[in-house]
């Protein structure tokens, strides 16, 4: 059952647009964000380099999430596709939550979309390239909201 699996901007993606996670998408989301580079300095008078290792911070990350889209017929598919583009992609911000991690909200910026693969009128597979600007901001309410 694919409804209740994925929420985008607070909406059940399957019930709203017929979209559900591809088999690789969850592991992509769960991949830890990289750290920012540590502050370091190479002194000419010392061997190696000095690295300040305390207080590591997360860096932004770019991810490519694979999705599947399905509908009962080609007209519904085209309608759902147009609505998804208008309601989500055109606004540029996606807040993604899954039933597998119910207390984690991924706040991402839409960058681009791949061409549909396996397009068969009522179903398709596509990938969204997203930027997660602050991987530490994954609570129910954004820490940047006033």
Enumerate the language-model features and the residues they cover:
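Extracellular/virion structural assembly segments
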Residues: 1-146
